[in-house]
Curated annotation (Swiss-Prot):
Family to which the UniProt record says this protein belongs: Belongs to the TPP enzyme family.
Species this chain originates from: Guillardia theta
Residues given in the record as Mg(2+) binding sites: 454, 481
Protein name, per record: Acetolactate synthase large subunit
InterPro entries: Acetolactate_synth_lsu (IPR012846), AHAS_TPP (IPR039368), DHS-like_NAD/FAD-binding_dom (IPR029035), THDP-binding (IPR029061), Thiamin_PyroP_enz_cen_dom (IPR012000), Thiamin_PyroP_enz_TPP-bd_dom (IPR012001), TPP-bd_CS (IPR000399), TPP_enz (IPR045229)
Reactions mediated catalytically: 2 pyruvate + H(+) = (2S)-2-acetolactate + CO2
SUPFAM superfamilies: DHS-like NAD/FAD-binding domain, Thiamin diphosphate-binding fold (THDP-binding)
Oligomeric form and interacting partners: Dimer of large and small chains.
Amino acid sequence: MPNILKNRDTTGAFALIDSLVRHGVKHIFGYPGGAILPIYDELYAWEKEGFIEHILVRHEQGAAHASDGYARSTGNVGVCFATSGPGATNLVTGIATAHMDSVPMVIITGQVGRSFIGTDAFQEVDIFGITLPIVKHSYVVRETKEMGKIVAESFFIAKYGRPGPVLIDIPKDVGLEKFDYQIVNPNNINLAGCPVLKNYDQNRISQAANLIKQSSQPLLYIGGGAVTSNSHNEINELINLVKIPVATTLMGKGIIDESHPLSLGMLGMHGTVYANYAVSECDLLIALGARFDDRVTGKLDEFACHAQVIHVDIDPAEIGKNRTPQIGIVGEIKDFVRDLIECLKNDINFDSEQSQAWRSRIIRWRKEYPLLVPKNINNLSPQEVIHEISTEATNAYFTTDVGQHQMWAAQFIKTSQKRWITSAGLGTMGYGLPAAIGVQIAHPNEQVICISGDASFQMNIQELGTVSQYGLPIKIFIINNKWQGMVRQWQQAFYGERYSHSNMEKGAPNFTKVAEAFGLRSLKIKSRNDLKLRIKEALDYDGPILVDIQVIADENCYPMVAPGKSNAQMMGINS
């Protein structure tokens, strides 16, 4: 350790930063303030010595989303800082986003001094209580000597089993207090009460294999848990062995190469026709790391209603929560799939050709109901734009905001595991840009693309300042239809075309000038003649760039499963 750090007082703040470094933390996203200043003062010395880097965002919500994007793209724990009061409450949406999508994060907030807690002191907020429903665990550090242990436990909890966010609230005087700091080994954490992560044996594997052998119309249903488990290789081996079609959720996107003949793309509300038909007609549904949420299932009692279900998840609370399976497996998806493959390989009675007629039927659906890229004579369609971006950008990381553009991106962008970063469960507008910042910090030599809408982008537009300050070469594409597009679509379809406060044209900023005000390069695309050339120009540019793309205002995102309808009852398709 350099002398500048050896000679520092071992305060609570020192213990915190030292513990973070020992846990391999390289980057922190945050915004300083009064209650957390002792920690920022300590951070100053550690940054100066190159141990760690802090990324200054322009709003605490941006810090939460950036650490979220960092975590999703690396598989490591994302870390963010904020001060007490409004600084802490500004994190709440980002914490909830991570909680809904099972993202490992450690959130560190400043708090008023211990003697002031409960007195309504300046910038005092009970962030511990506020966030209880949206974290895996929370701590208030009341004893400075507990700092190292609390940090170690927080990292363990954030990653153990089903990942999620953990909050550490640190009173100001704890950060300042000197004490005899005892280093806690990050590898020596063993918390009592942690649930067993496996409930199956070889007999359960054999039962699952028997269901596969009996099935003539099987389907794999892959969720975000499969991505988190790093089971890409095992799942692809299973797909090729069984010759089983696979549909993914929004979070499961990337687990299989979407050009694979057995890939059906996304299922659910805006899924492909053939994925939704397949789940409606299958006789066996194997759900891996998926939670049967409403946006996937449509009318729940008609979801995979002809199928027996095998449900595998690391979280026992998910098994049977929305759909009772014939076989419920709690365990690591990677381990289960590996065991299942071994069982099937050793079974001389297993024949993948028994589902040949089923695969042929799906091929016919694909030909009959392809995803279409409409080309309007006078104006650009959003689908055309996103398809062109996907065609030009190879092996990029993609982040999105939330709305129509998110669904079109999910339909048309072909990407791989952990290169698709989006807010799925909470559906957080304003997520895309700060998440892209986190991804770019984590992968400085990779191309990072943020696809946003004109409404979503304005939610966290201030983070252009962070992009500018750190020279992050993010490519930002705004699909600009001058509407809250998904809201308008629902108002058109279900609310008698009463467009209550969903039009964004009046007061809309000139995005290219806003970008330029932050010192960033910008482009505007209005016609098809410019589309391919300008997109390539943006992607080839070696710095940050914002591209404002004017698209058809009233284009709707189809297919669409209306609320209360089954997945087989889709709007916007030719029947």
